[in-house]
Amino acid sequence: MVSLLVNPDALQKIAQKREFSQIKNSLLAKSNIDYQDDIQPWLNNEITLAVTTLDIDRDPDNGLQTGYLMALATKNPVKSREFLELLFSKRAFAGNNLEIERYKGVKVIYDHQEYSASQISNSLAGAIVNNFVLFANHPQVIKAAINNLQAPDLNLVSSLEYQKASQQIPKNSLAVTFFNLPEISKWQKLELAESTYHSQILSLALNSQGLLAESTFLTNSQIVPPSLPLSQPVAALQYIPESTTLAISGANLSNLGNSDLAKLWKQGTATIYGSSEDGISRLIQPLIKIQQNLNLNFSQDIFTWVTGEYALALLTNSENAIPNWVFVVEKTPQLAAGIAHLDNIASSSGFNVISLTLNGQKVSAWTQIITTNQNNQSINLETKVKGVHTTLNNYEIFTSDLNILKEILSQKQRPLLENPKFKNSLGIIPQPNQGYIYLDWETGQNLLQHQIPVLKLMELLDKPLIDNLQSLTFSSYHNQPGILTGGVLLKLN
């Protein structure tokens, strides 16, 4: 179920007026309906679209015939009734056979034909019930909606799951979406793998920085956060450069695999891609490439000993498709053993573990000596740096590039915490929370879309929104029994 809780004209605050007009015109292109003349005079502040049943006739032998219902709030019943009659009269002139039926006191008008799975997608039924204009792809869907209205214990509002989820909806929401996850999986012919979460409610709200999308997942299982909630951004972010394209920060990676976020990730990726491992490789290609380049397994070789604060950043690399990276870890009793383990992996992978001095700072490096041949005559030796790390104050800083470490040590570039786009986002994301994931869309759009294919899909789905996008900031918060809530702030121009 998707509900738009404002008049569509108000959405011009998000999309440019020209772009919004194009969207409205494309939706009505085949109906000979003019939005401004025929719909705008009566349309009020709610439009709801729902998948009400997976199979209208409940006969699996003739395939799934999904039932769709649209409800539009009206502020002028006379005008909306005129619109309904106009719409169906145009369908009659186009050659459709119409039928009018009284059902429980409600006038239902619909295309009269034998409904096959292919015909249902082009069929239409309509009615006016109280202050709503109803449309569906089959009269049975309209009748079921009337039954639900007259028998409140049958409708969605009476569902305990919906009541629990709807309590999390912000009061200023522009739109709300509710998903019954097992039913959604059946509809899309997906197998709901590792089904920890059974329901989801998503809301959209405008604020001074852009658009906040909050999502709440419901489960009957115990919620296990990866760490104690953080009341402020981790101090490790002070060593992450302002020009960062992607930054991930939080605390205690050692418990990440058993956390609520990990279960949600596994459920989503396994359902969509068939396995959580395949989903990870498709969605976070940059991290997978870094892992392969260093012969590491993040969960086994790093996460186990990171029990304090951490911050990971990806930066664009003009010389290589693999982005540069920075990883900052708070000092803990487990740190020394963790570094020794990484040194052993580097040595066993054929890298040299050496020490050097940079800006008066002792630095350890993992290097590889390779040969270069010039003009088939002289052979030169070249040292290739795979990674460097050093201790600074209460943190260990790892990076892929010696020049990046030099900039961090010399403080030539402001930290991410002083980046206005990131800093302003922090005031919108609720606290306490589990940390942040930050994407700078303006500086890293090409890299991110190439390395994270799902972001390319976002642009295809909503180009006007993406064209005005500056950055995205994700976080998880409001952990309550059986509830996981998180949000993403889309900072807009």
Predicted regions and their residues:
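Residue-level signal for secondary-structure boundary sites
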Residues: A10, V78-S80, I142, S185, ...
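Leucine-rich, highly hydrophobic segment in Treponema pallidum outer-membrane-associated proteins
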Residues: I120, I128-V129, A136-H138, A145, ...
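Short secondary-structure boundary/capping segments
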Residues: K17-F20, L149-P152, L192, N220, ...
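Single conserved position on a long alpha-helix in the C-terminal lobe of the eukaryotic protein kinase
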Residues: Q40-Y162, T304-N424
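C-terminal/domain-terminus segments
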Residues: T271-I272, F327, L457-L461
